[in-house]
Amino acid sequence: SKEMILGSSGNQGAGAFYSHQIEQSARLDYADNSHFDRNYGDGTDGSNTDFTLSFWIKRVGRFGSTSILINPRDGTSGTALNEVGWDTSNQFYFNNSNSGDTILKTNAVFRDPTSWFNLVISADLNNGTNSERLKIYLNGSEMTYATDNRGSYTSAAGFGRGGSWVLGDYYSGTSYTPDMYLAEHVYIDGTTYGPDSFGETKGGVWIPKSVSGLTFGTLGYYLKFEDSSNLGNDSSGND
C-alpha cells in the first residue's frame, strides 16, 4: 500500500508539495475515555444507503483490544446502530450491530504506532453488484477482506439515522476508546465518494486533498479539530 504523508500537522514537511495541508489533529486517549458525541434530533434522518466517511489516523496504542472508531445510533429505536473499529486481532471491521453481523473485516492488521494513514468507507447499498455496495480504502487503495457479507447488506442501521452518534467509543459508555490521533474527519450523507475525493498520490505518497467542494448532505459534517476550545466544531456549514 502507498505511504501516507499528512503535511504540517504530521511534522513531515510542507510547502509547495501539498495542495492542502491538515493543520491540527485531536488526541483520543483511552486512559481519559476521550471521545466526541454528536447528537441529532430524533427523526432527523438522511440517507442510510448512500454515505461516505474519511478519517486520517495514527494509532499509538490499544493494540490487541477492541477499539471503536465510530458508533452511530438511530435515535428512534435507540438500539439500531453501526459499529466501526478494530478488533482484538487489530483487523478493521464494519458491523451492522442491529443484526449482529460483521459486514466487512479486513485481512490487513493495523498495529504500526508511527504512521499516519487515511481510511475511506464508501457505501452505495442499493447497488446491484454486491462488491460495489460497501468498500474500505486504505491510502487510496481498496482493501481485501477476511469477512465479506455485503450480499445481505442493503441499509445501514445507524448511518443516515438521526440520534446519538459517538466518535471514539461505544454508545453505552463502556470504554472502547482507541489510543490514536485523528485528523480531518468527514462524514458525507447522501453521496458515495471514492478515496480520490480525500487524497491523491504525489511523489509516490498519499497526501490530503481539500474537501471544501464536496456536498455534505443533511447529516454530514467536517471536523478539522482546529479550535482547541471547541474541538467538535463542524466546518461543513451544517452547524
Model-derived regions: residue spans:
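Extended recognition patches within non-cytosolic domains
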Residues: 1-24, 31-32, 128-130, 144-150, ...
